[in-house]
A protein has these predicted regions:
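Conserved Rossmann-fold NAD(P)-dependent oxidoreductase catalytic core, especially the SDR/UDP-sugar
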Residues: 63-103
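Glycine-rich NAD(P)-binding loop of the Rossmann-fold in SDR/ketoreductase-type enzymes
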Residues: 23, 52-63, 71, 82, ...
């Protein structure tokens, strides 16, 4: 496990913790030395000033991929986001090969993350899988999550499938979302990513207050697509 701070609880199976800043290419490479798989989940997880997103998400991912190239790591799993396609309409079941329509600067940073993964797969032969992660929560707590929820159980299943995908997989992008009845995104092709999600947010619909209807003509991102969601992160 690699993090900027020491976790409050030790990792499972007596794993080793490395305290590393993703902005430091030398220490990233040192920490990854000897690994054969990398699950890269680090970065700024939501809308923020663009310089912060570029530094953590884009430059940090570049350091991970470059370390993988230099040390001979076989597979890199990159955490992308559903926010890469947040401006597609809610009524459209979106697939991973459709054009990016990011709903904010965070989504833009994840478009760049995927592009870096594609570059390192095409140019340097790394095996790279990008998972466009849904709303990762213990249970859905707001109306949009009825479409976007990713349960902990399904998250583990997707990650395991990505790590064990055939070695012939050079580059793959897939949505990591539970099998929600109202989902916006296509589930992965089982021939590419061998996992079938099992949890459905609809089982929790009665627990969520408010109007649960989704405007089919509105953006999948919902409130994240509003101008103010990005503008409030401007620096003075």
């Amino acid at each position: 496990m690699i993090d900027r701070t020491v976790p409050s609880e030790p990792p499972a199976d007596n794993g080793t913790v490395h305290t590393v800043d993703l902005r430091d290419a030398v220490t990233v490479e040192s920490a990854l030395s000897g690994a054969d798989r990398v699950v890269h989940l680090g970065g700024v997880p939501d809308e923020a000033p663009l310089p912060d997103l570029l530094e953590a998400n884009v430059l940090g991912t570049h350091h991970v991929l470059e370390a993988a190239r230099r040390t001979g790591i076989e597979r890199v799993l990159l955490a992308s986001s559903n926010r890469v396609t947040g401006f597609h309409p809610a009524a459209h079941l979106t697939g991973p090969t459709e054009p990016a329509r990011p709903d904010g600067l965070y989504g833009v940073s994840k478009v760049a993350v995927e592009a870096l993964g594609q570059l390192y797969a095409d140019k340097f032969g790394l095996s790279v899988i990008c998972l466009r992660i849904g709303s990762f929560e213990a249970r859905p707590t707001e109306p949009r999550y009825l479409a976007t929820w990713l349960s902990p159980r399904d998250a583990v299943g997707y990650i395991k499938a990505a790590l064990t995908a055939p070695s012939s997989t050079r580059f793959l992008t897939a949505y990591a979302v539970s099998v929600n009845s109202r989902r916006f995104w296509q589930l992965p092709d089982a021939t590419e990513l061998d996992y079938v999600p099992v949890d459905n947010a609809e089982a929790h619909a009665a627990e969520i207050p408010g109007d649960l209807a989704t405007d089919p003509t509105g953006a999948q991102a919902g409130l994240y697509a509003e101008p103010e969601f990005t503008l409030k992160h401007r620096r003075p």
